[in-house]
């Protein structure tokens, strides 16, 4: 009576579960059929054999995607770098990644914090003045994209807004550079208020530019000048890494001015920027005046000086790049130290330090680098398989009967995540973008939702009569948008670049 004994075991187990206050006793083993129903199959010898698990997937704001294998990720990185026009992955000295400190006892942690406070260690690269200025430019571009295609969600990760928030990348203090409590030197923004770092002129330059680069001051120690120029300050910038084909459309030197509260609080200052033409060992350097500004002692904000002419010269002939000099003169003709006039130098707060920014426009069409042979072979094999499928489908007019069950040509979602590619240490913004793609059937009759061209309509009719000789129209993008990418280069300079035709806005039959 094997069946009766098994039922008796089950009754005893349930009785113990009801009458016991502690955990239930061990459940008796199930028959093979019940075990299979529970999700685990028993193989030969009683060993468990589990069904093959699906490949791991991730989700990003509603997008589900398969994790790339190592070689797939490497190939994807190479191809996207080629699209971005970069020969290799940038590795900035001061990027976005901060090394995680080791876990220390509380007493040692307190000592370490005191040492860091005394040392005033520099913050991450993203919290300095140049990256913050570039981030404002990036947000200005992103806001324009949102106004142009708010209904499309173009270039954004779903659930996000195209621009990167400045508050996410910086923690402003009460005396931060962008808090202008007195008369501002900044031009009012489009909304009537003063922008944190950018001005209306910067926005105009941005509309005409394909790329914007910021440059940090390379001078670490003040130079000994002659008595006549003893209050001059020197600045040098490296413009040797400008991509080929880029021409300077505008360039600015930006320096922050604090409110003067000392002995010069009622003064008016003439601030001048000079290009160094030639340096001499025993006399003053030869200088060329580039731009001047007259400011009051009570004014506070960013000063902008036009250095477009000298920047073009430095790009064409780098050997002439001997830097800039800044001088400050009172209305009485007295040369004073720039610090006495409220100008912040390299030893000031990191979000107020001077920097240079240049706007570029491409002078020739960018040509992508040649792909590897393996990529071409894979593409050719895919093309051959696609052609064979097209030949097999084009056997007669019955193709249209089957295509009615297929999806019509339309836009589909495709999200490219820079973070999943491991680029979060050098790409400041965005974290990724919605590239999208076009797919679907272009079958007769072509309705208005397919955005078909007149040529596509004629080709569809001819294909209907001669499917063996004339293929159907293809589902392809009809409108493409650009994206903007903000990133560090190898020298920790910040670059904002526009990339055209990166986002599919609409699809149609061609």
From Swiss-Prot:
Keyword Glycoprotein: yes
Signal peptide: 1-20
Disruption phenotype: Deficient mice are viable and fertile without displaying overt effects in tissues known to express BMP6, suggesting a functional redundancy among the factors of this subgroup. However, these mice show a significant increased liver iron content.
Propeptide: 21-371
Gene coding for it: Bmp6
UniProt record similarity statement: Belongs to the TGF-beta family.
GO molecular function: BMP receptor binding; cytokine activity; growth factor activity; protein heterodimerization activity
Keywords carried by this UniProt record: Chondrogenesis, Cleavage on pair of basic residues, Cytokine, Developmental protein, Differentiation, Disulfide bond, Glycoprotein, Growth factor, Osteogenesis, Secreted, Signal
Pfam families, per the entry: TGF_beta, TGFb_propeptide
Protein name according to UniProt: Bone morphogenetic protein 6
Sugar-bearing residue positions: 238, 266, 383, 401, 451
Disulfide linkage: 409-475, 438-507, 442-509
Primary localisation category: secreted
Gene Ontology annotations of biological process type: BMP signaling pathway; cartilage development; cellular response to iron ion; cellular response to mechanical stimulus; endochondral ossification; eye development; immune response; inflammatory response
Subunit structure: Interacts with SOSTDC1. Interacts (when glycosylated) with type I receptor ACVR1; the interaction may induce HAMP expression. Interacts with type II receptor ACVR2B. Interacts with Hemojuvelin/HJV. Interacts with ERFE; the interaction inhibits BMP-induced transcription of HAMP. Interacts with BMPR1A/ALK3. Forms heterodimers with BMP2 in vitro; the heterodimer then binds to its receptor BMPR1A /ALK3 and may induce HAMP expression.
Sequence ranges of Low complexity compositional bias: 106-116
Function: Growth factor of the TGF-beta superfamily that plays essential roles in many developmental processes including cartilage and bone formation. Also plays an important role in the regulation of HAMP/hepcidin expression and iron metabolism by acting as a ligand for hemojuvelin/HJV. Also acts to promote expression of HAMP, potentially via the interaction with its receptor BMPR1A/ALK3. Initiates the canonical BMP signaling cascade by associating with type I receptor ACVR1 and type II receptor ACVR2B.
Domain of life of the native organism: Eukaryota
Protein species of origin: Mus musculus
């Amino acid at each position: 009576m094997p069946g009766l004994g098994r039922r008796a075991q089950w009754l005893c187990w349930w009785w113990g579960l009801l009458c016991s206050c502690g955990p239930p006793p061990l459940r008796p083993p199930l028959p093979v059929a019940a075990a299979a129903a529970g999700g685990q199959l028993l193989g030969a010898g009683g060993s468990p054999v589990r069904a093959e698990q699906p490949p791991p997937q991730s989700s990003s704001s509603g997008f589900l995607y398969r994790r790339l294998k190592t070689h797939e990720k490497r190939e994807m990185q190479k191809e996207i770098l080629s699209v971005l026009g970069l020969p290799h992955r940038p590795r900035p000295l001061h990027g976005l990644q901060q090394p995680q400190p080791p876990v220390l006892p509380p007493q040692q942690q307190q000592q370490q914090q005191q040492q860091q406070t005394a040392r005033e260690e520099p913050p991450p690269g993203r919290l300095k003045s140049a990256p913050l200025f570039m981030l404002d430019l990036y947000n200005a571009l992103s806001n324009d994209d949102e106004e142009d295609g708010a209904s499309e969600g173009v270039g954004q990760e779903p659930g996000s807004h195209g621009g990167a928030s400045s508050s996410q990348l910086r923690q402003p203090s009460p005396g931060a550079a962008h808090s202008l409590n007195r008369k501002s030197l900044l031009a009012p923004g489009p909304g009537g208020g003063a922008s944190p770092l950018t001005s209306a002129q910067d926005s105009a330059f941005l509309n005409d530019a394909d790329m914007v680069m910021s440059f940090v001051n390379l001078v670490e120690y003040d130079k000994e000048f002659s008595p006549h120029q003893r209050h001059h300050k020197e600045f040098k910038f490296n413009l040797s890494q400008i991509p080929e084909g880029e021409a300077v459309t505008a360039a600015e030197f930006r320096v922050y001015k604090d409110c003067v509260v000392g002995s010069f609080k009622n003064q008016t200052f003439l601030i001048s920027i000079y290009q160094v033409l030639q340096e001499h060992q025993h006399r003053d350097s030869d200088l060329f005046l580039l731009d001047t500004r007259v400011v009051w002692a009570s004014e506070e904000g960013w000063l902008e000086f036009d250095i477009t002419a000298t920047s073009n010269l430095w790009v064409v002939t780098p050997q002439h790049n001997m830097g800039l000099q800044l001088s400050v003169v009172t209305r009485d003709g007295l040369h004073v130290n720039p610090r006495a006039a409220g100008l912040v130098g390299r030893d000031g707060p990191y979000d107020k330090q001077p920097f240079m920014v240049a706007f570029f426009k491409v002078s020739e069409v960018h040509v992508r680098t040649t792909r590897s042979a393996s990529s071409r072979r894979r593409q050719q094999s895919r093309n051959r398989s696609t052609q064979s499928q097209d030949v097999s489908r084009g056997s007669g007019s019955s193709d249209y009967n089957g295509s009615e069950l297929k999806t019509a040509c339309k836009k589909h979602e495709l999200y490219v995540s820079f973070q999943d590619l491991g680029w979060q240490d050098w790409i400041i913004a965005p974290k990724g973008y919605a590239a999208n793609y076009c797919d679907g059937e272009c079958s007769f009759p072509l309705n208005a939702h397919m955005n078909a061209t007149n040529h596509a309509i004629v080709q569809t009719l001819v294909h209907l009569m001669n499917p063996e000789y004339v293929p159907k129209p293809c589902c392809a993008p009809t409108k493409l948008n650009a994206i903007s990418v903000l990133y560090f280069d190898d020298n920790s300079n910040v670059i904002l670049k526009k990339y055209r035709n990166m986002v599919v806005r609409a699809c149609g039959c061609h």
